[in-house]
Amino acid sequence: MEWSEVEVHTTNEAVEPVANVLTEFGAAGVSIEDVADFLREREDKFGEIYALRREDYPEDGVIIKAYFLKTTEFVEQIPEIEQTLKNLSTFDIPLGNFQFVVNDVDDEEWATAWKKYYHPVQITDRITIVPSWESYTPSANEIIIELDPGMAFGTGTHPTTQLCIRALSDYLQPGDEVIDVGTGSGVLSIASAKLGAKSILATDLDEIATRAAEENITLNKTEHIITVKQNNLLQDINKTDVDIVVANILAEVILLFPEDVYRALKPGGIFIASGIIEDKAKVVEEALKKAGLVIEKMEQQGDWVAIISKRGVE
């Protein structure tokens, strides 16, 4: 088989939106080369340091590589893919020194290239995300989430995902009922299940995302707790007594449904909203307040913000 590699040079803030666009166009795998990953401390709790090479990383920004079967349909779609990526700037997503290049690669190269950039990520002192092909020995009481990031719908390495998992770790109580809006890889649903949630509804509008979520949920043996549904946000979801709603999606999308979140939550229920670029945080905060939610706190990692709000006790 012939494969094409789409290489995009952009900013860290644009990683997840760009990766999601590429996957929606049919990418079979995505790798992310971020110089910040090389520069930050990579020592784990066993004193091991991952052997990463500086030459594998860009001088600045992020390089995202996506792999497509080189079909006639793909070749015809190349201009549309490039334009869709450029259009992300209309959502105030900074693309930086945007570059878009298409190369041919052999079958073996695309299948393994991205694996060297993805290693276990310790999110909290309790939760670690581990790629499915790596052997990892957890410590006592450590929660392990296994992911195959080939579909690139949230690998746990992005700040927005980490902010959500930390908030879930802080607020989720055993026996809680959770809705995960825009589930992507299913990582937040899996984290919720392993933190003790009784039942979780994971929704995503994208069919590819729901398939990726189902595969990862099965990998983590949490399918008896998590139900995956292809759905547009909370549309036609009639739950009204939910403990936690979590959404790791763009601010512009969060603004579409705060009233629906309020209706879904029970009194005292928590809404964890991430995927919010710093410049949009105030707008989202005001929309949540207008819907009747009370802001509990805001957490920030880099340029990304998570807002934790609550439905008041009536």
Swiss-Prot record:
What's the catalysed reaction? L-lysyl-[protein] + 3 S-adenosyl-L-methionine = N(6),N(6),N(6)-trimethyl-L-lysyl-[protein] + 3 S-adenosyl-L-homocysteine + 3 H(+)
**The keyword DNA repair is annotated on this UniProt entry:** no
Supply one GO CC term from the record: cytoplasm
Q: What keywords sit in the KW lines?
A: Cytoplasm, Methyltransferase, S-adenosyl-L-methionine, Transferase
Write out the GO biological process terms.
methylation
Looking at its record, which EC class is this enzyme?
transferase
Q: Name one GO molecular function term.
A: protein-lysine N-methyltransferase activity
Source organism, top-level taxon? Bacteria
Q: What is its EC number?
A: 2.1.1.-
Q: Which residues bind S-adenosyl-L-methionine?
A: T161, G182, D204, N248
The record's InterPro entries line, in alphabetical order, gives: Ribosomal_L11_MeTrfase_PrmA, Ribosomal_PrmA_MeTrfase, SAM-dependent_MTases_sf
Question: What is one Pfam family matched by this protein?
Answer: PrmA
Q: Where in the cell is it found?
A: Cytoplasm
* NCBIfam families for the chain: prmA
Q: What does this protein do?
A: Methylates ribosomal protein L11.
Q: Which family does it belong to?
A: Belongs to the methyltransferase superfamily. PrmA family.
- The name under which this protein is listed is Ribosomal protein L11 methyltransferase
The scientific name of the source species is Listeria monocytogenes serotype 4b (strain CLIP80459)
